[in-house]
């Protein structure tokens, strides 16, 4: 049987979940444009020391994240990003995250061998200069590493992406696309001539999702697209079988030497394939 891999990028329910928190007072249009600032970082180190490095900044057409409660954290994570308006010192955006790097820190390998991991975070594109603070937390919720850097939105070295790299197929349009949950299926391990198979597999996965509550009754809140990113080889790599394949995202089993743990470490590639499609994380 041929192997098929479908990577899901499911956007958090930030736009429709009722958060029991104080209403935020940051107006999106006062501080941001309708674009995305992609923050590419390298997280590196071992159990004794973790470091954060800026890799690249990218401006992508369109912003598909939340536009309300911008300065409030929607959920806890193992790290967080805070944007502060440089002129006023006001916090204008916060978001939390959890990364594969931080998961790896719990492994035996992290005790003896320093490694680095790509990480990509999306924030709304600022109108004016901002300070960006990145914090990593340890297992006791203490800050283990932090980096603060300044971003001028007019910086000529911010790379711009204005159009999708791949064809985007809409499987289902939400009743209200300004207030919805966005799902993007990314083709990984499908050749160019297999895109019909990819779309069919995505449809099967979609129907399986909506067979269950609360998804069935909330179906109209979901906006679902497919990103047709072709691979040279079919399937995914399985290192413990010495089976390596050339795929768009370089995904493989055996992450952290666990046979069934399937991931991609190439997050910049993933976000390049997704660029300008309607997704948030």
Over which residues does each language-model region extend?
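Bacterial Sec-dependent N-terminal signal peptides
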Residues: 1-24
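Short amphipathic alpha-helical segments with coiled-coil-like heptad repeat character
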Residues: 2, 89-92, 212-216
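Sterically constrained small-residue positions within well-ordered secondary structures
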Residues: 10-12, 30, 72, 112-114, ...
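Sparse recognition of residues in long alpha-helices and their boundaries
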Residues: 97, 221-222
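Short intrinsically disordered coil segments
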Residues: 98, 241-242
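Fold-level signature of zinc-dependent metallopeptidase catalytic domains
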Residues: 156-216, 220, 226-236, 242-243, ...
